[in-house]
Amino acid sequence: MKFSIKTIITIYIITITIWISKTIRLKAFSFYHTTPQIDSLLENLPSQCLPFVSINATVSKDTSLLKYYDISFNNPEKPNQPKDKVFILSGEHPREMIAVELVFKFINSLCKDPEYLHLLDKNNFRIIVNANPKGRINVENGELCIRTNIHDVDINRNWGYRWSNEIKPNQEENPGSAPFSEVETVFIKDALTSFNPKAFFSIHSGVYGLFHPYAYTMNDIVNKTEANNMKTILNIIKEKYCKHCYVGSPAQMLRYYSYGNCLDYAYDVLKIPYSFAWEIFSKKIRFEALEEKKRENELKHLINPLKVRKTQDKQFILDNIPTSFIEKTYTESENQMCVNHFNPMDRVSYDFIISNFQKGLVETIDYINSH
């Protein structure tokens, strides 16, 4: 088969374009961990954290190449000391990469940071870092706005409490064909149920919010003691770490109903008295402390602040990333903005968000231990 010169040139241009776009994409996400990197680091945790950690790796039913990791932390040196149980979950929605990074950093701090040892004296942890690995890999490969799993199901609408199938299947909050129809949801539910924790954290991004139940209704929590305990600590965290965060019920704060979600299941079905959903980043809101960090960094590196801000306003990273998104509810321009909305795209912002909310997470756990 012979190709014309025009065809050969076209193929060459397409090949170069794909290579350049992939290079730009990798550069844009260079400080985010990929799924293979996360898996490798988790596999090596026992050798770094002994005797504190054990790993349960479950092979996915969808492919033998992927595993779901369930990490347990405890301090066996104090076996008779009463401890609280804390369950932390991230990665349900693949495009929310910063949520996974926060929890991954928290795991490493439990292993290596002496300031975190007191948490292991008082708590047993069970942590799922990357709850939707196949979806996450698609995001890493350029499909930057994916919220669902490989079956186009939102696994945080697939829980068997107040589940509803009113959402059309082509929308990104598709709840699935039935409650717990998805392997990811079943995996999380089994781990959460068997652990029976005192506290549950589900970490996300997209807004700034520190939420307690409910997400499916605007009704208040009936148990006033539990409601007050959750509101008290969330308001403390808001004041110290996120002054513009919404605090309260997501349904009430956002005027938006989320059926079949893990937050309400954890609280109403499993009776976990401290059930939280944290939203830790949104591009739409300026974080005063973060802006100060950026200004300090600009001065430190002798960069013209006005030039930097002008470049950022032009979305210089995203405009150069041609992508193929599977979501049908976004326009092309919205797709290009999507990853930037859910995740910080510069290193200063990335480091600040992780450090800031990690401190908030530690303080929340300390509060729970004292009550």
Regions found by a protein language model. Give the residues of each.
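Classical eukaryotic N-terminal signal peptides for Sec-dependent ER targeting/secretion
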Residues: 1-12
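Acidic, glycine-rich loop-and-strand cores that form catalytic or ligand-binding grooves
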Residues: 218-253
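Active-site/substrate-binding loop(s) of hydrolase catalytic cores
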Residues: 80-92, 96-228, 279, 325-344
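Active-site-adjacent mobile loop/cap segments within catalytic or ligand-binding domains
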Residues: 200-202, 208-224, 260-371
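N-terminal signal peptide
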Residues: 13-31
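Phosphate/oxyanion-binding active-site loops and adjacent basic polyanion-contact surfaces
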Residues: 34-38, 60-64, 96-100, 180-184, ...
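Soluble metallo-hydrolase cores and metallopeptidase-like ectodomains found primarily
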Residues: 30-84
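Active site of divalent-metal-dependent phosphoester/diester hydrolases
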Residues: 144-145, 241-268
